[in-house]
Regions:
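Glycine-centered, small-residue-biased loops immediately flanking beta-strands
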Residues: 180-181
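Glycine-rich beta-strand-centered segment in the early N-terminal region that forms part
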Residues: 1-38
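Helix-to-beta-strand junctions that scaffold the AdoMet/dcAdoMet cofactor pocket
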Residues: 86, 176-177
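Short helix-loop-beta connector
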Residues: 27, 58-61, 84-90, 154-155
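Mid-domain Rossmann-like dinucleotide-binding core that forms the NAD(H)/NADP(H) cofactor-binding site
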Residues: 69-141
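C-terminal hydrophobic helical "lid"/dimerization subdomain
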Residues: 220-258
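Adenosine-nucleotide cofactor-binding segment
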Residues: 109-171, 219-223
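Rossmann-fold NAD(P)-binding glycine/threonine-rich loop
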Residues: 190-203
Length: 258
């Protein structure tokens, strides 16, 4: 738990106004972004350790960098390192209309994967399609396990990227192919507390990982390389960031609730 009182926010972009006497990596005037602790990004000024910051290239606006650093790095490590996605891979991605789906799905599409996205409402089906999904399943009115089998047959899915958790876990395991990969990176619907190795892993020789951004940016070189790939993907048009609302800092909470 975060000790209270506390600021909030983990992701921001801005220009450095002051540096400490031992700072070597950046100087006043550099434009940087971050996607990590210490918390407090939703503020006019924020003190950050230099090793958590990344340079923002020309051509990437402050607004886009503020939106893409955390989710972009997440998409990068999921697609390139947790499971290195290949052309022709069949992918199941849950919550495909969300903010991360806006980045990950078109990026996966650019690699040449076939993407099946799940959503939780009728209005989100079109969003998932725009995000690059070749097939969209609304799991509130259809069994996604049955629908996936209709699309790919009984051979199954190469990789499932599951940020939903408890609600989708069993079905995600079921649709994977022999030696498929389960990338469980979130728990929006609740935590999966127990994994039955015999039932969930051994039955099909599955691979399982529970990654987080901290695991994949533990070395500064990893953070820099990941951020570079993200910003290059933005500049090359592999995905586009849609920002629905802008506002002053004092309006942030109202905009979030709206």
């Amino acid at each position: 738990p975060i000790p209270l009182p506390s600021g909030i926010g983990l992701e921001a972009c801005g220009v450095i106004e002051e540096v400490g006497p031992e700072v070597k990596l950046f100087k006043v005037g550099d434009r940087v972004s971050h996607a990590s602790m210490p918390i407090g990004a939703y503020s006019e000024k924020h003190i950050m350790p230099e090793n958590k910051l990344v340079p923002v290239p020309d051509g990437v606006s402050d607004e886009v960098a503020s939106c893409v650093t955390l989710k972009g790095i997440t998409a990068e490590y999921l697609l390139h390192r947790a499971y290195p996605l290949k052309k022709g891979d069949k992918v199941l991605y849950h919550a495909a209309a969300g903010a991360l789906g806006q980045i990950l799905c078109p990026w996966a599409n650019s690699i040449g994967a076939e993407i099946i996205g799940t959503v939780g409402s009728k209005e989100k089906e079109g969003i998932a399609k725009k995000n690059g999904c070749h097939h969209v399943i609304n799991y509130t009115d259809k069994d996604f396990v049955e629908e996936v089998e209709k699309i790919v047959g009984k051979n199954g899915i190469d990789v499932v990227y599951d940020g939903v958790g408890l609600k989708t876990f069993e079905g995600s395991i079921e649709v994977l192919k022999i030696r498929g990969m389960m990338v469980a990176f979130g728990n929006a619907s609740g935590y999966v507390d127990t994994i039955d190795v015999k039932k969930h892993i051994n039955a099909k020789g599955l691979f399982f990982t529970r990654p987080s951004i901290a695991h994949y940016t533990i070395e500064r070189e990893e953070l820099l390389e990941s951020a570079k790939k993200v910003f290059n993907a933005v500049l090359s048009g592999k995905f586009k960031i849609k920002i629905s609302k802008f506002g002053k800092i004092e309006e942030v909470f109202r905009l979030l609730f709206d």
